[in-house]
Amino acid sequence: MTKEKVFISEADQYLFAQGTHYDIYKKLGAHLSTEDGVQGVYFGVWAPNAAQVNVIGTFNEWNEESHPMQKLGEGGIWGLFVPGVEEGTMYKFLIYARDGRRLYKADPFANYAEYRPGTASIVTDITGFDWKDSKWMEARDKKDMNKEPMAIYECHIGSFMKHPNNGTAEGFYNYREFADRIVEYLKEMKYTHVELMGIAEHPYDGSWGYQVTGYYAPTSRYGTPKDFMYLVNELHKAGVGVILDWVPAHFATDAHGLAEFDGQCIFEHPDPRLGEHPEWGTKIFNYGKNEVKNFLVANALFWLREFHVDGIRVDAVASMLYLDYGKKDGQWLPNKFGGNKNLEAIEFFHHLNSVIRGTYPGFLTIAEESTAWPNVTSGIGEEGLGFSFKWNMGWMHDFCEYMKLDPLYRKGDHYAMTFAMSYNDSENYILPLSHDEVVHLKCSMVNKMPGYPADKYANLRVGYSYMFGHSGKKLLFMGQDFGQEREWSEERELDWYLLGEKLNQGVHTYVKELLKLYRKYPALYELDNNWDGFEWMNADDAEHSTYSFVRKCSSGKNNLLFVLNMTPMKWENYTVPVPKKKKYKLLLNSDEERFGGWGNEIPAEIMAEKKPYHYKDYSISFDLPPYG
């Protein structure tokens, strides 16, 4: 198939210098091209401080002098068409720095990279994939996800499941093989979205994908770019959305990467007080430079347009917003007003979210922001950052700390579990139980829980009940939906054999039932960030460590009452205030034997009585099971 001619025009250079060339990835990088009837590859790279740039690779036996690039204009872009180069060719840019160094750099815009520990870029063609997800894409752009169910399965492909027979030490499934397994699992469990960790190319497995060298390349650990397209396509066909972890906060310092790319700091800030993360040993992007902002904004659009991704979860937003994040005195510089806010990063978020909101309203931007920064999900015109959702890290912290307590002491910290509702309407929240909570000696979710094994799993079930009843979208890291007992490690697969154990199978079945209810009843998602969608029945029964509340929908039909007991005690004839005199039907009892419980029963139907209790005119009474 003959390719059109690729070239970099003066208009391309101008827009890139302005920071508004959102198709720049179609010009910079390596692109199959035809010039004067001759097929080959057009190479383009931004290296404004280089004395010279040459292309080296398998096509010229890595000859360092044979293919010098031409500098195009004053913007620092270099270009060269090389006849005869084909897809699959490995290459690098040889940068001659002004201080005399020779730098062997991978292509920042490459779409495919050599399998690690190799560091070369690979010529590839990402056009021409036969997408079959048009129905999904059309429906996506019409949805208001604030009013839709969102239950996210956070997943690391390399450790989800290991391949027993692929002949490698890592045992990675490729994207296509993984698709066959993950699609079936997510459909069975009723998750709405999957959030994939570590997709952008990165050299070190132990970074989990958070120290990136190839922002425009799906990692070759699991196959080719079109293999990754296949994965997204299959997920969409199954009705599952795809969110990627995206890391604009910092990047890896590996020699072949972006750091000191042309001998000087062009992607990072040259002052280490602004350009380095001492805590992480990484470089910080220079958000005040137009070309850098362009690189990042175009990258988000690249995943959206070329790979049909449905959203990005922006990692470490707090580290971008605060100039002194993770730094000691003397390691940071204040802004022009003398404060610690990173004004350039704030403007970058405005730029990113305004471009996305204005063109692709169905595409989600999700902030992992761990402080109380205001208006993260407010519109940019309302002095907000413009994100679609924010992880509720405060809820996560309070939830985990409370659930770790021995039930005897929970009454003393009762309001930790109610506090998040006091600020729930301030942002569009996602409730995350993510990978960060099951590593570094924090224990898996089930092993955070107190007591003997049966108590631990009962705690987990009632904890998940609280999570799914609480306002906010949901996120569970892989393995936590069946009670993975070991902490997560990127080096090994989940302990799937545990599904043969009664307690693990019980939790797995229970989470499946919660997800089914969550998707069925609009009361559980339609008014998440609105006080009209939530009403406490009794938030104050610290003595019994119980909570009761009602979730509501706009129609007023099928509102749901939650009653939760956070102790191992069975509270007999327990009274719960209710809003109306009506018959209340049991939907789910976490103490059923099929969930691994002790089998304490709750009546299938209970009629409310005219017995005022806790500010309500009506109430119901029943035996409330332990951890039920």
Predicted features, each with a name:
Residues 70, 204-209, 253-260, 377-378, ...:
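Short glycine-biased active-site loop of nucleotidyltransferases that positions the nucleotide triphosphate
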Residues 174-178, 224-227, 291-296, 341-348, ...:
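Soluble or luminal CAZymes and related metallo-dependent hydrolases
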